[in-house]
Amino acid sequence: MVRITMEDGGIIDIELNEEVAPITCENFKKLVKEGFRGPIYCTKSTEELCSILLPDSAHIQEGEAEYANRKGMRAGKKIVEPLFTVDDAARALHLFKLRSFGEAFNVVPGVTVTFRVAGHILGSAFVEMSVNEGDKKTRLIFTGDIGQPNQPIIEDPAVAGGADFIITESTYGNRIHEAYDKEGELANIINDTVERGGNVIIPAFAVGRTQVLLYYFQKLQAEGKIPEIPIYVDSPMANRATQITMTNPEEYDEEARALYAMQGRRLVSMHNLRFTATVQESMAINEIPGSKIVISASGMADAGRILHHLKHNLWREDSSIVFAGYQAEGTIGRRLIEGIKRIKIMGEDIRVNAKIYNMKGFSAHADKQQLLAWYSSMKEVPKAFFVTHGELDAAMELADSLGRNLGTATYIPHFGDCAEIHGTEWQMHESEMVQVEPAAIDLRAYMRGMEHDYLLQRSKIEQIVARNPDKAVMVRKKLEKLHKYMDDILKDL
């Protein structure tokens, strides 16, 4: 959120989101539900993707609220309202205003915004903002998710000229992508499964991952590296997202554009590719003899049609289940890649006999080295980086690396922090926009005191060990006990 105080005392709030994703969609609908009626600026493909994601997630919210109320009424509980409705989604979509990449436009007087290619998923952009306040000018960049370079289909992240302040993501701020031949591994999995007579089942995110997989399958088939067995995309949302991807060639990279032109304005053209629409068509897939590839949502295998395909294939020793995306803690996908032997799906207890693969080379996120390289390519170093949008350990490591490599200030915001910026000068304080309970304020102050004490103890320990290295092992053991004790007493919060 950017709050701009005008010279006449007026206040303008600007909400910034860089791409279409479930949490971003929920933000849009929540704002609209609470009365927001201003413009929502986005790229063409983002608007098209939102047109399927917003109503779909609203429909899920309504269904969950209806289910909760059916149970709750019997127990005498209060009526639950959905967080947002299909009507809220429709109202949000009417507020969308399209802007092209590279097009500078005024959101309010004195504030100019430009979308640049972020290279994460179709339509994703990082935001360059210029704010003019009298004789002071401030340039900001809001990165959102920056994409991993050399992904199929979409362009690499555009090079930014620089800014006074950068609000950066840190999703992979402490990780480096493993470099390996993922096309070769994918081909080996398919060939081995076909040789056994089984099916390849791939839980995949509807937006981005499904389209990348189709691109790879087409390439592997054209090179004769995999057989032309039936390929099914069994997800209504993935079907529509794929259609949107196929009709936005202006966002393709050079290789994809050449392929699109060569194939008669079709990015993916495989005679063995089928898109299923109805539930009946989906269920019929498992009755078709012979090996096949099935791509279905959800990507973490917690809901959707993929459950039906897992139910029919997990017990088969000849089938393979291939995960090509992050699997969150507690999801079916996570339990399968961790080696669970039996799992309940759709009310049925199933033995896991299929081969389980966890391919790690498909992330659309730039890793730590790629983020550092992207920032190093800028002509100017910012006055400060505000490191956000990541787990604390990832944010801390990226902030440390940015400071050491670029020699600039870094700050990891806490909940309720406000960065007040005037031109190129900045200071942090607690925001008046966030209502915080007094007990929470006291707790925050106490924890900051703990952080101060920790730094003093750390400095003391480092000095002791520097004078007497033999004590390092003993100190490490004491710290490990302290760490375990803290984990134990805080784990049930």
Feature roles, as predicted:
Residues 1-32:
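Start-of-domain signal
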Residues 6, 121-122, 205-212, 299-303, ...:
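Gly/Ser/Thr-rich loops at beta-strand to alpha-helix junctions
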Residues 9-11, 35-36, 192-201, 227, ...:
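Short, surface-exposed connector motifs at secondary-structure boundaries
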Residues 50-52, 151-152, 176-178, 241-243, ...:
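Short, charged, surface-exposed secondary-structure boundary motifs
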Residues 137-143, 149, 169-177, 203-204, ...:
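Acidic/glycine-enriched edge-of-secondary-structure segments
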Residues 233-252, 415-428:
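Long, charge-dense
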